Regions:
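Non-heme di-metal
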Residues: 1-139
Length: 139
């Protein structure tokens, strides 16, 4: 049976998303613990975040044969990774964040809408940086 399109493929994508989010949450929690002067707690969160990164990378190893879980584009080699990153960042600055900003503004969350609009600009910059790297990539 082929992995791509299977329930196991979806499980790997879901697991990758969950582990990735756990990593970022734990790093955020570690920063909060640092502010509170809870150095031991911060260290626990940081070391656990690193473990979650290992789990996420393991999922990506299996997903390489199926395509990037965010863009469905091939990934693994630098050229493919850059193309996938450009596609992901482009989606974020052209569709995702502008749509989120519009919704937030319509619901009366102007500050959050402004935040989303700021992020759209940052994502455009990221896409441009990846494009420049792709343009000079030697084969």
């Amino acid at each position: 049976m082929q992995l791509k399109g299977s329930k196991t493929h979806q499980a790997l994508k879901d697991a990758f998303a969950g582990e990735s989010q756990a990593n970022r949450r734990y790093l955020y929690f570690a920063a909060k613990a640092d502010v509170e002067g809870q150095n031991d707690i911060a260290a626990v969160f940081r070391s656990t975040a690193e473990g979650e990164t290992g789990h996420a990378h393991g999922h990506l190893e299996y997903l390489e044969s199926c395509g990037d879980p965010a863009t469905n584009l091939p990934f693994g080699k630098s050229r493919d990774n850059l193309k996938s990153a450009i596609a992901g960042e482009t989606h974020e600055y052209t569709d995702m964040y502008p749509g989120m900003a519009k919704t937030a503004r319509a619901e009366g969350f102007a500050e959050i809408a402004d935040w989303f609009e700021t992020l759209a600009k940052a994502e455009r910059s990221h896409a441009n940086r990846f494009q420049k790297a792709l343009d000079v990539l030697a084969d």
